[in-house]
């Protein structure tokens, strides 16, 4: 993260190697992000892209495919000159981790390309592949010596999901750390590329009005919501083996939670920030099986209409097992065992096929003493929320009470809202630009470390175990296009609380 936007420096010359270059992720996010960086003059002076896939094609065929993807998914109008210059540096290599000689050919191609284009031997390997290919690909990179740093840097970018449970996450970390050092691994979470997410630390620690009251003495509870309108679609096979908890909680929601709840880092650097984030995840209480079932909600969507689209029952989705117990919605109540947050519940929820698309963090402050308002309309006091909106718009909103004009003391809730777009000019982006740029300059402050990954999985493992033992018992339903299952409201109602209403 660059502190001064005017001080951004060009990354060192490098080769950018994309495994899974023919896939959706490359076309939809990675290449549009590289294009935006090129448009902002934030790519290295000497730069080349090497696309890797299992099925062969020519350099020109790959360039045509990537250009088509740019025109379809770019977040800003495509300048032909910029696109041409970017795509001219693209070459293709056919390689498969199951075919070791193909990785020898990849190494030879990179060696030759680096001599010709003077990229200095620096290499960024981006795994835009299915998770099953992560470890085999890393092993081949290690076997061929392509991760060795001999006067040049070598970095590996890995997409989520990073494991499917605590055991698999530990195993994958173990595999990677046999091959390379922790500083070479960039576990990417695109949520951290969003400006509002990055601004959470600034909001907390750069404003004297917030940090003194950011604790159990003044905060009643915190809600973290990630709602999606889309159903599972054509990803039934993947999703049925994953579910909402595995797909969203250990990464996206825990990243938001750790930024909101972490202690102030000693310094604003990668080691200090990542250590505090891992520490807060380690401090999440581990519930018993009975407590895990009581503190969680899981549900599947039934058929319904969202806009003009008819959404079928989740269990009738292609490649979903007829009697599936995989959740498309999850809500959790979590507690943190430390001095700052003792007794403050964190309510997390995420789901698919819901009536709204939104991502937000809502901090509910404790109610002020009401004795001075005796005899007035105190029942109309609204809740004091500080809400950090991440999607669909990036906002910070403060909800508080004020007197309605008139002779009597009547109180109502009012809002102050800050919208990023009203104050700062920013070109539309994918959210990946900052992350890819940081990978190239070697700033890993926005990327997860092995201990943080494992702490996240350790925190959700009790829920996974409890659900597995419960089988289909406890699976609720909700209609597609609704606000989710009624039992999610009950999770808070038992504590005398309610979810913040979408406005």
PLM regions and their residue ranges:
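Secretory/organelle targeting and membrane-embedding segments
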Residues: 1-158, 162-503
């Amino acid at each position: 993260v660059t502190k001064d936007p005017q001080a951004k420096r060009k990354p060192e010359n490098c080769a950018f190697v994309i495994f899974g270059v023919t896939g959706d992720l490359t076309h939809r996010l990675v290449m549009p992000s590289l294009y935006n960086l090129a448009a902002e003059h934030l790519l290295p002076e000497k730069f080349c892209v090497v696309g890797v896939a299992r099925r062969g094609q020519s350099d020109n065929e790959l360039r045509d495919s990537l250009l088509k993807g740019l025109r379809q998914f770019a977040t800003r109008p495509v300048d032909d000159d910029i696109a041409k210059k970017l795509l001219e540096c693209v070459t293709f290599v056919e390689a498969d981790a199951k075919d070791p000689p193909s990785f020898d050919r990849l190494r030879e191609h990179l060696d030759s390309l680096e001599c010709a284009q003077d990229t200095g031997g620096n290499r960024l390997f981006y795994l835009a592949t299915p998770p099953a290919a992560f470890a085999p690909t890393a092993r081949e990179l290690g076997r061929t010596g392509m991760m060795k740093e001999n006067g040049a840097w070598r970095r590996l970018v890995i997409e989520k999901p990073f494991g499917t449970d605590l055991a698999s996450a530990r195993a994958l970390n173990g595999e990677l750390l046999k091959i390379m050092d922790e500083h070479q691994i960039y576990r990417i979470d695109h949520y951290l590329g969003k400006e509002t997410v990055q601004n959470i630390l600034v909001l907390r620690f750069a404003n004297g009005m917030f940090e003194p009251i950011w604790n159990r003495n003044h905060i009643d509870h915190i809600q973290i919501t990630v709602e999606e309108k889309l159903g599972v679609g054509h990803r039934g096979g993947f999703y049925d083996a994953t579910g909402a908890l595995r797909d969203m909680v250990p990464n996206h929601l825990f990243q938001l939670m750790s930024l909101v709840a972490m202690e102030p880092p000693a310094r604003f650097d990668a080691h200090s920030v990542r250590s505090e984030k891992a520490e807060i995840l380690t401090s999440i209480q581990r519930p018993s099986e009975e407590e895990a079932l009581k503190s969680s909600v899981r549900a599947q969507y039934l058929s319904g209409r969202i806009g003009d689209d008819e959404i079928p029952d989740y269990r009738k989705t292609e490649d979903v097992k007829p009697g599936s117990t995989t959740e498309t919605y999850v809500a959790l109540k979590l507690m943190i065992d430390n001095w700052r947050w003792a007794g403050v519940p964190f309510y997390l929820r995420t789901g698919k096929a819901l009536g709204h698309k939104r991502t937000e963090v809502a901090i509910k402050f404790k109610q002020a003493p009401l004795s001075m308002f005796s005899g007035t309309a105190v029942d109309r006091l609204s809740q004091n929320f500080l809400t950090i909106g991440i999607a669909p718009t990036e906002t910070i909103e403060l909800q508080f009470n004020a007197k309605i004009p008139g002779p009597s003391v009547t109180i109502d809730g009012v809002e102050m809202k800050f919208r990023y777009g009203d104050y700062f000019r920013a070109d539309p982006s994918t959210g990946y630009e900052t992350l890819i740029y940081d990978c190239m300059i070697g700033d890993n402050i926005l990327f997860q470390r092995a201990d943080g990954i494992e702490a996240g999985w350790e925190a959700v493992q009790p829920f996974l175990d409890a659900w597995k033992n419960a089988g289909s018992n406890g699976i609720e339903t909700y209609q597609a296009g609704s606000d989710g299952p009624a039992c999610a409201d009950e999770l808070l109602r038992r504590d005398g609380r309610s979810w913040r209403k979408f406005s």
